[in-house]
């Protein structure tokens, strides 16, 4: 017997943000560590090039992707990790995903203001 009004879940959009964050972290963070942690301090990449890239529309898009999506992945892991440890935070989904949404809005306006 099928239900006439199935309950909608918020999991698909949250899992989308979680998986995007994990994928972007795995692909981009090693490159960022190489550029910002090794090549920049050694003087092999000029700071002016990084700043110029950050001021382009593509650079801003990269900064947004590298900062927003991993936050969603991290908050999703914290939320489900606490649940797995039987620590039930009141309205945990609203708190963790709400903080991620607030962070996303703040980062969006900060990057646009670059």
From Swiss-Prot:
GO terms for cellular component: fumarate reductase complex; plasma membrane. One of its GO terms (molecular function) is succinate dehydrogenase activity. The chain crosses the membrane at residues 27-47, 50-70, 94-114. Coiled coil: none annotated. InterPro entries: Fumarate_red_D, SQR/QFR_C/D. It is found in: Cell inner membrane. CDD domains: QFR_TypeD_subunitD. GO terms for biological process: fumarate metabolic process. Pfam families: Fumarate_red_D. It is a multi-pass membrane protein. Keywords: Cell inner membrane, Cell membrane, Membrane, Transmembrane, Transmembrane helix. Part of an enzyme complex containing four subunits: a flavoprotein (FrdA), an iron-sulfur protein (FrdB), and two hydrophobic anchor proteins (FrdC and FrdD). NCBIfam families: PRK05470.1-1. Anchors the catalytic components of the fumarate reductase complex to the cell membrane, binds quinones. Belongs to the FrdD family. This is Fumarate reductase subunit D. It comes from Actinobacillus pleuropneumoniae serotype 5b (strain L20).
């Amino acid at each position: 017997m099928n239900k006439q009004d199935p309950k909608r879940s918020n999991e698909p959009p949250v899992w989308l943000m979680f998986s995007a964050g994990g994928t972007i972290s795995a692909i981009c963070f090693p490159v960022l560590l190489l550029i910002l942690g090794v090549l920049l301090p050694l003087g092999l990449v000029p700071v002016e090039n990084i700043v110029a890239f950050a001021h382009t529309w593509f650079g801003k898009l990269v900064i947004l992707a590298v900062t927003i999506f991993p936050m969603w992945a991290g908050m999703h892991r914290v939320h489900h990790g606490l649940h797995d440890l039987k620590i039930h935070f009141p309205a945990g989904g609203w708190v963790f995903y709400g903080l991620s949404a607030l962070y996303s809005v703040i980062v969006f306006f900060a990057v646009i203001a670059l």
